[in-house]
Amino acid sequence: MEKSLHLEIVTPDKLVLSEQVDYVGAPGFEGEFGVLPSHIPFLSALAIGSLYYKANGKTHHVFVSGGFAEVSDNKVTVLAESAERAEDIDIDRARKAKDRAEQRLAQIKEKVDHARAQAALQRALARMRVRGNA
């Protein structure tokens, strides 16, 4: 049995992470899922939230804003709309985004705008939670 697996997180703009890890936990649409070495292959849609991984006895957190995770051949590949390591998150920017989204939610009448504001609020809150784990 393998002792580690490879985790790769990619966005349309860049490669965010490429490391050997011991465990991956991710926010799936149906709930959080975990992947250990030698896991069976599967594909899952990702929700907005905190992906975390364990490597060398430490837990690391990465904000992901949707996308997909593929598990195959002892590798987890995450294709995310956006992703940021916890230590790279600008907490002031996240707080300002949260405040803007809450203001829009208080004013919005149309459902389309409401959904966009709600998604922006979810992203801001998730970034703040992930940054709190750094």
UniProtKB/Swiss-Prot annotation:
GO CC term (a single one): proton-transporting ATP synthase complex
Membrane disposition: Peripheral membrane protein
Gene3D superfamilies assigned to the protein according to its UniProt record, in alphabetical order: ATP synthase delta/epsilon subunit, C-terminal domain (1.20.5.440), F0F1 ATP synthase delta/epsilon subunit, N-terminal (2.60.15.10)
Coiled coil stretches, renumbered: none
Main subcellular localisation: membrane
Keywords noted in UniProt: ATP synthesis, Cell inner membrane, Cell membrane, CF(1), Hydrogen ion transport, Ion transport, Membrane, Transport
GO molecular function: ATP binding; proton-transporting ATP synthase activity, rotational mechanism
Top-level lineage group: Bacteria
Subcellular location: Cell inner membrane
Keyword Chloroplast recorded: no
Entry keyword Amino-acid biosynthesis: no
NCBIfam families: ATP_synt_epsi, PRK00571.1-3, PRK13446.1
Record HAMAP family: ATP_synth_epsil_bac
Subunit structure: F-type ATPases have 2 components, CF(1) - the catalytic core - and CF(0) - the membrane proton channel. CF(1) has five subunits: alpha(3), beta(3), gamma(1), delta(1), epsilon(1). CF(0) has three main subunits: a, b and c.
Family: Belongs to the ATPase epsilon chain family.
Function: Produces ATP from ADP in the presence of a proton gradient across the membrane.
Protein name: ATP synthase epsilon chain
Organism: Nitratidesulfovibrio vulgaris (strain ATCC 29579 / DSM 644 / CCUG 34227 / NCIMB 8303 / VKM B-1760 / Hildenborough)
Gene: atpC
